[in-house]
């Protein structure tokens, strides 16, 4: 093949991985029969076979031998459904640390060894990185961002994706409690249409949903507790038809750490509603005196007391240092305080915010929105207008830039070099830990702000991640 055509096909493959194509940006397409050269007709199915070929021989047996009794029972249930073409829909429930991800890997390696085709997705890019070949459910299944009760996935029956779904033996969908139930319902309708089996859930495909309802539930802006519960998968008509499986044994506590075990039990009790003081509301929790600190400065010094030794600290330091808070405003305040404790020179990057007028929106108020007001907005999904950084500080990526390379929403990184338009980062979490990546300034148009219009602001798409 002509070298120029090889480069065109190389870039075309990158576009396909992001759900786009060369025609979208008016770039030339490959003129030679690439399908024939690679003996493939569907690149999505070919990717699944590539996963099978990459698996070490006998790896599935090693994983199966490590399953505990609860995991083995769930493993056998799912395996029977796939091998007998039963099309059962499961929900795997279990708190963090009970081995849900390990069970997913064991299922995937076993079925890949048998030549089965499977799709692994999760609600977020970070969770997807923990699954074999994992991607976000929205990107794979083309789920609308603005989901409604009657929404369907944007998948044509004649597309390569539809062909992949039609021959899929198992779908694993992790962290589904975080997503609106309409997402699963939309995909259910789409699968029925693709498989021409309107009477079978998900068109007769075996599906394993997984997650923990003790953790983050669907985010409903300004929603009441009742509205949040109504958005959960448990309120979906699909829930009654699911086979429930539960894991309870915390694999992280099998080394005898008594203090950690006590904390895990206390934390689980909060989720079960067992830590509510008598005579108080359900939103209040009793903390032990040993968990409390005297002041904000005491908390910062307790967690980040060695920042003056930053050049000598390794990546494990930031793995073990985190402060959690539910409010973005508190995150902003604490991050500013802690960042000033880092050695080195502070550098500030400014975004270029402006209002974009949408078709059909005629609101005189939009013309009165000043740049200062736009700069003052603080949302969890967009970076700050003024981004303060120092070399050596941790940051968190806010969008899925390159999931296959471990750069996705929620990935934590260390800033190793600061340029005017590009930053060099060292990956701290995810599937590509230890790799170096380069992040440019990017324009972003948020869709969920309390404005009648959107605005883009070219800047680096991450936030300081000291919390």
Identify the role of each PLM range:
Residues 2-467:
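RecA-like helicase/translocase P-loop NTPase motor core
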